[in-house]
Amino acid sequence: MNILLINGPNLNLLGTREPEIYGSKTLNDIENDLSSIANDKIINLECFQSNHEGEIVDKIQDSIKNVQGILINAGAFTHTSISIRDALIGSKIPFVELHISNIFSREEFRKESFLTDKAIGIISGFGISSYSLGLYGIIEYLKNKK
């Protein structure tokens, strides 16, 4: 089973960017933690981060034939990107939407997501644990889908 983790803009700054909201772990720390979980479950996990919308769309499209599930924290693109939404829909790859903070308890503009209604699930507000919860969730979903 192949799972793709996508992180959007500014998530490369985790560990230094607003640690009171996002915590002190770096993106590399998160990816290492998830890779350990994936290895224990005999899952192939590919991690990808980009600050560029088109690169994220390209990555989704390039994954159509070899990825069974996607975890995505689209960052600010969650609230703005119809092209990422369309790429996810067009790929037909099941995906879980992730957020470190609870986007529904923040500023008004963060409460709208272009992804939520197409995701198999959303995990928001559990800090860095949102990533591992999402990974466990998509693994179970894919196992039960077979």
UniProtKB/Swiss-Prot annotation:
CDD domains found in the cross-reference section: DHQase_II (cd00466)
Residues forming the catalytic site: Y22, H99
Known EC number: 4.2.1.10
Top EC class for this record: lyase
Gene Ontology molecular-function annotations: 3-dehydroquinate dehydratase activity
GO biological process assignments: amino acid biosynthetic process; aromatic amino acid family biosynthetic process; chorismate biosynthetic process; quinate catabolic process
Pathway: Metabolic intermediate biosynthesis; chorismate biosynthesis; chorismate from D-erythrose 4-phosphate and phosphoenolpyruvate: step 3/7
Sequence positions that bind substrate: N73, H79, D86, I100, S101, R110
Catalytic activity: 3-dehydroquinate = 3-dehydroshikimate + H2O
This protein's UniProt keywords: Amino-acid biosynthesis, Aromatic amino acid biosynthesis, Lyase
Matching Pfam families: DHquinase_II
Gene3D superfamilies the UniProt entry points to: Dehydroquinase, class II
UniProt-annotated site: Transition state stabilizer, residues: R17
Oligomer status and interactors: Homododecamer.
NCBIfam families, A to Z: aroQ, PRK05395.1-1, PRK05395.1-2, PRK05395.1-3, PRK05395.1-4
Role summary: Catalyzes a trans-dehydration via an enolate intermediate.
Family per record: Belongs to the type-II 3-dehydroquinase family.
PANTHER family reported for this sequence: CATABOLIC 3-DEHYDROQUINASE
Protein name, entry field: 3-dehydroquinate dehydratase
Organism the protein comes from: Prochlorococcus marinus (strain MIT 9515)
Lineage: Bacteria, Bacillati, Cyanobacteriota, Cyanophyceae, Synechococcales
